[in-house]
Amino acid sequence: MNVILLIPARYGSSRFPGKPLAPINGKPMIQHVYERASLAKGLTNIYVATDDERIKATVEGFGGKVVMTSPDAASGTDRINEAIKLLGLKDDDLVINVQGDQPLIDPTAIEQLINLFERQPGEFEMATLGYEIVNKADIDDPMQVKMVFDNNYYALYFSRSRIPFGRDTQDYPVFKHLGIYAYTSKFVQTFAALPLGRLEDLEKLEQLRALEHGHKIKIAISASNSLEVDRPEDIHKCEQRLAAG
């Protein structure tokens, strides 16, 4: 089984234009993501999937590989689907999708997802990660996506709101969704062909498309929290984390 890690990256973020090229400790964010992801064991290859020549030039400048995709991709997974076709991946190849705004991605988190597919082949087509929230302020932050799952670690729902809601207590674990996915190449093509889901459109969370159409998403719990850069002020948080080791 080939394991291909793809990093979708676009320049035109509405909240943070040019985000993948934003410097963090003197190095563009996309380079942090690429270099940390490449430390994961078990990868066959790694590419940045982008529609922007500036991102392409930056990635190739530090020795990374790029696949150029259309600017019309509706979501990161749709961009991944286009990259799969351009790269000629086989149906049973495993695709890891790491967002281009995760400069602190833990390589062992990527390995967790690879191990899930190796231990339970054929039992599911898509998997992702969660992390038990420690900073309680994150629970009510709509930029921090929350998740609930069943006793067999299959996703029930993802939301920008607090889930579950404790009617009589606030003393219970809440899990953050870490924006990293693993799926078979074949399933990515299936996913991309599905119509936009109602819940997906409301929450602006593409993973809900899979749940709305009856597909299972396997969950693994990570020991590390991957800080996403959603706003310019998140850059300073990343630099603080890097300085702390």
UniProtKB/Swiss-Prot annotation:
EC number in record: 2.7.7.90
Keyword Cytoplasm: yes
Organism whose genome encodes this protein: Shewanella sp. (strain W3-18-1)
Name of this protein: 8-amino-3,8-dideoxy-manno-octulosonate cytidylyltransferase
Record key words, sorted: Cytoplasm, Lipopolysaccharide biosynthesis, Nucleotidyltransferase, Transferase
Keyword Cytoplasm: yes
Catalytic activity of the protein: 8-amino-3,8-dideoxy-alpha-D-manno-octulosonate + CTP = CMP-8-amino-3,8-dideoxy-alpha-D-manno-oct-2-ulosonate + diphosphate
Role summary: Activates KDO8N (a required 8-carbon sugar) for incorporation into bacterial lipopolysaccharide in the Shewanella genus.
Major site of localization recorded for this protein: cytoplasm
HAMAP family: KdsB
Biological processes annotated in GO: lipopolysaccharide biosynthetic process
N-terminal signal peptide: none
GO cellular component, one term: cytosol
